[in-house]
């Protein structure tokens, strides 16, 4: 079924490419990545800092132009999806800044048989309400004040409530661990998860660069989290190890 376009909306992008998911619960999953340009935050540890701003290198594309790129990439890599449903990973930047674009493109990708993987900083909960019914996987961050200069606890709680309101999707939380991460931040994270959706998987993701946390702190954060939550994993970003996108 072909859906009519409601408008000729555009959004800024840095790249559309094929790779394997490099972090969290779906590590190793073949995906087509769609990277938006622009973010509403500026975290110190961001591993795609170039995508925070919309520079001259960003390309402004329409819904149909992005779909065409996805279809070409899928055709070239079809064998990689032989044993799994093909999925589109919307990443950034922050995809939810462009919710009007997402509302147009996601239903069209779903009718083409693609699953939708949303990677987000977990702050724009009002925008999430407009597309959550289409999302198969939601990878949301908890952003800590120690690295992002501001707390987003209220936003994260509301975001998690909306993300888990659709019972048929997969939702998990990623927390970047740096040398500045505090036990109080871990405690607040646990408090929100326990009071909102206690079975949501929590991924503690240590930084691998100069900001990496001390091993004893990682152990402390992990053991403390496991004391109160059932589903906690300590996991590094594998794509950085293998130097793939």
Features from the language model and the residues they span:
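Conserved alpha-helical substructure of the radical SAM core
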Residues: 47-89
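Short, solvent-exposed beta-strand edge segments and adjacent coil->beta transition regions
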Residues: 29-31, 85, 172
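Flexible, charged surface loops at secondary-structure boundaries
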Residues: 27-28, 74-75, 81-83, 110, ...
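Short, Lys/Arg-enriched, disordered terminal segments
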Residues: 1-10, 82, 111
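Short, conserved beta-strand segments within well-ordered enzyme catalytic domains
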Residues: 33-35, 87-89, 117
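Conserved AdoMet/S-adenosylmethionine-binding subsite of the radical SAM
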Residues: 97-233, 237-245
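Canonical Radical SAM [4Fe-4S] cluster-binding loop centered on the CxxxCxxC motif
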Residues: 6-65
């Amino acid at each position: 079924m072909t859906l009519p376009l409601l408008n000729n909306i555009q959004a800024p992008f840095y790249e559309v490419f094929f790779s394997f998911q490099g972090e969290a619960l779906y590590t190793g999953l073949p995906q087509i990545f769609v990277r938006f340009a622009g973010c509403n935050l500026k975290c110190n540890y961001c591993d795609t800092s170039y995508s925070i701003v919309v520079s001259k290198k960003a390309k402004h594309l329409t819904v149909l132009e992005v779909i065409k790129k996805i279809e070409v990439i899928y055709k070239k890599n079809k064998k990689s999806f032989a044993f799994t449903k093909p999925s589109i990973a919307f990443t950034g930047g922050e995809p939810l800044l462009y919710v009007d674009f997402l509302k147009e493109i996601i239903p069209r990708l779903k009718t083409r048989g693609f699953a939708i993987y949303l990677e987000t900083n977990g702050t724009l909960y009002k925008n999430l309400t407009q597309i959550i019914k289409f999302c198969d996987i939601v990878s949301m961050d908890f952003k800590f004040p120690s690295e992002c200069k501001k707390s987003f606890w209220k936003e994260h709680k509301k975001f998690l409530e909306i993300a888990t309101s659709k019972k048929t999707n997969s939702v998990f939380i990623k927390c970047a661990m740096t040398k500045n991460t505090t036990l109080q931040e871990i405690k607040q994270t646990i408090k929100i998860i326990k009071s909102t959706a206690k079975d949501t998987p929590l991924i503690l993701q240590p930084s691998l660069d100069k900001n990496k946390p001390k091993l004893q702190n990682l152990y402390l954060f992990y053991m403390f989290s496991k004391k109160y939550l059932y589903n906690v994993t300590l996991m590094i970003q594998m794509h950085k190890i293998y130097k793939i996108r």
